[in-house]
């Protein structure tokens, strides 16, 4: 079930280095340029408490189950304190990661994915985005981009998921493809390997078609 509020809830998903954060922010800016009230947010995060949980999950070693429970707590806080209030005001909420990332990162198989979905339905009132865009890139390109990003940031603060090997990134890429098959009406996959401007144009095309708007490029 998608959200039943006035505004629209759009999420961006993808592997580390896919360009999803860049594309989500570009869409947010495009909405504002077109006179549409919008806010940008991210997971794990979006509220003071959720941001504290983010630092714990991204930089501390723990079991997948512990990660899952912390993320669910952060998401509940995020939905109740930020996402739903903004949607109720008629704003579009653009979010960098949501439930689909949890399905890919915090599960090992389809059975665990179903458990996560059951928790999501019971604890989070079956709250799903109106539309999800998965930005796909190959694991090798993802790892190249992670290295370039870190050089430009001039910092050693790679999180534990950035630091994983190519086999891990391949697993996440495959998981996103599988998750997209679970929600074909909600999820659209986009090739994230072309130039940023070309990917952004594809995002705008999809938003115009799916959300019945006419965003000017």
From Swiss-Prot:
InterPro entries: P-loop_NTPase, Thymidylate_kin-like_dom, Thymidylate_kin_CS, Thymidylate_kinase. GO terms for molecular function: ATP binding; dTMP kinase activity. The keyword Oxidoreductase does not apply. Keywords: ATP-binding, Kinase, Nucleotide biosynthesis, Nucleotide-binding, Transferase. One of its GO terms (biological process) is dTTP biosynthetic process. ATP binds at residues 14-21. The keyword Hydrolase does not apply. It catalyses: dTMP + ATP = dTDP + ADP. Phosphorylation of dTMP to form dTDP in both de novo and salvage pathways of dTTP synthesis. This is Thymidylate kinase. It comes from Orientia tsutsugamushi (strain Boryong) (Rickettsia tsutsugamushi). The lineage of its organism: Bacteria, Pseudomonadati, Pseudomonadota, Alphaproteobacteria, Rickettsiales.
